A protein has these predicted regions:
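Double-stranded beta-helix
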Residues: 7, 139-145, 151-209
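Non-heme Fe(II)/2-oxoglutarate
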Residues: 39, 43-46, 197, 204-205, ...
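Structural motif
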Residues: 116, 145, 160, 217-219
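Short, surface-exposed loop/helix-turn segments at secondary-structure junctions
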Residues: 50-56, 121-131, 175-186, 216, ...
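A short secondary-structure junction signal
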Residues: 115-121, 128-131, 156-162, 171-175, ...
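Short edge-strand/loop segments of extracellular domains
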Residues: 110-111, 163-169, 223-229
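Non-heme Fe(II)-dependent double-stranded beta-helix
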Residues: 1-11, 18-135
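A structural signal for short, well-ordered beta-strand segments
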Residues: 105-107, 146-148, 220-224
Length: 276
């Protein structure tokens, strides 16, 4: 992270990294999704994410994608590559330290009219897995998300939204504000071109605005934790253990369970320093 990126992330709690993915990587992700549409599950009404919000209501629930790391080849390959992407790893080393690990991942598909997601998280939450601190001259985070934009998310489209700076807030956001039913000018819809990565701390108050664009929103969310911590109950995505030998040393390092001593680590340039 350069000086400007550090300042922006510390101030806002998120950062957009443009062109994190190449055109080829982007095409491979979209091709994989196109060939596995049967893996998408649209949320039924009883699992709605919009709560009691009037503003976030939609015509249908969000589409969720799971299991990308174990899809048949070649469709799993682009998502395995993203695990330890050379552009992203240096950011994770800065925010989570050199022994970071994958906590969990999933994909999001939103078509025109898909509901939004109530804003959640924030600096007031007493959660030992969702935190943001500045310590000894460096930022450090708990659970941190890398949301890869597989399609464009332009102005007014909807999608990822947050309250910038709320990762350091001292007051909880009022309920009608996180429902987006009252606008006091603090919520931002974050624009991201396809191929961009939105990196944010889960300590940030964030959620999703209803999708209003004619094209689908496609986003793949990789959620990482510091090496000794876990948020998810399980340590590996379902089915991965059986095919772990197919992953590269860098990918296997990131799939390690939570522990502290003698973890495989990455240098600030993203190079694996200690292989398993």
């Amino acid at each position: 992270m350069d000086l400007y990126e550090k300042y922006f992330f510390d101030l806002n709690g998120y950062l957009v990294v443009p062109d994190a993915l190449t055109a080829d990587e982007l095409a491979q992700c979209n091709d994989a999704i196109n060939n596995n549409t049967d893996q998408m599950r649209e949320r039924p009404e009883e699992k709605s994410l919009s709560g009691e919000s009037r503003t976030l209501k939609g015509q249908q629930g969000r589409g969720d994608l799971d299991g990308m790391l174990t899809w048949p080849r070649p469709w799993c390959d682009p998502f395995r590559h993203l695990l330890a992407h050379p552009v992203i790893v240096p950011y994770l080393v800065e925010l989570l330290r050199d022994g970071f690990r994958l906590d969990h991942l999933y994909g999001i598909i939103m078509r025109l009219g898909t509901e939004g997601h109530v804003l959640h998280g924030g600096g007031t939450a007493d959660d030992l897995t969702h935190f943001y601190q500045y310590h000894n001259g460096r930022m450090r985070c708990g659970l941190t998300v890398v949301a890869g934009a597989v399609t464009d998310c332009g102005p007014g489209d909807g999608g990822f939204a947050c309250i910038p700076g709320s990762h350091k807030s001292n007051y909880p956001a009022p309920r009608d504000v996180i429902l987006l039913d009252k606008d006091i000018g603090v919520v931002t819809q974050v624009e991201a071109k396809a191929g961009s990565a939105i990196i944010f701390t889960e300590a940030l108050t964030h959620g999703t605005m209803p999708w209003k664009a004619s094209h689908d929103r496609r986003s793949i969310l990789y959620k990482y934790s510091p090496g000794p911590l876990t948020y998810a109950k399980t340590y590996l995505p379902q089915g991965v253990e059986a095919v772990l030998d197919e992953f590269t040393p860098e990918q296997r390092a990131i799939l390690e369970p939570p522990y502290r001593p003698n973890r495989p680590t990455f240098a600030t340039d993203g190079i694996l320093r200690q292989a398993i």
